[in-house]
Amino acid sequence: MQRKTVWCVGILLTCATLFSPQPSLSAPTPEPVPESQPITQPLRLEIRLKQRRVNVYQGDRKVKSYAIAVGKPGWETPIGNYTIKQKIRNPEWIHPLNGEKVPGGDPENPLGRYWIGFWTDGKNWIGFHGTPNPESVGTAASHGCIRMYNRDVEELFGKVSLGTEVVVKN
């Protein structure tokens, strides 16, 4: 009797597998729909000369603000609309009056370790950079450039791209 029971159970299991719905023949399983990714608006930099600040906007929302130094009398930072044209790590600095060069990476390099250029007349450049003189940030001290604390310009360097809009206002 045990043999017949085992044999019958075996046949029943075989039949059950043969007649059960196959995955390929059953209703399709719906694919998970990925969550939509937010559309990231490009950054825009707004330099406020009188406030000695650069504000970082994403769309209309201010996402960051940094203290800056601006051009001193006779070397004023030009007002206008620009775009970032250069990003350089460890830039070489060339003195605008005597042509003296200070190599990139030199602790005395007035540009610090990061350069973000947004204005040129074909010979001279103006841009964001660090400084070996952090006490100058918040003043009118540069030859037209935007000096920043080294940690701030490093952070900004990582956020912006070539073509990022730069607006300089009083």
Predicted regions: what they are:
Residues P28-T29, S36, T40, K72, ...:
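Exported/periplasmic cell-wall-interacting domains
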Residues V9-F19:
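Bacterial N-terminal signal peptides
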Residues Q2-C8, P21-P91, G105, L111-W115:
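Cell wall/extracellular polymer interaction/catalysis modules
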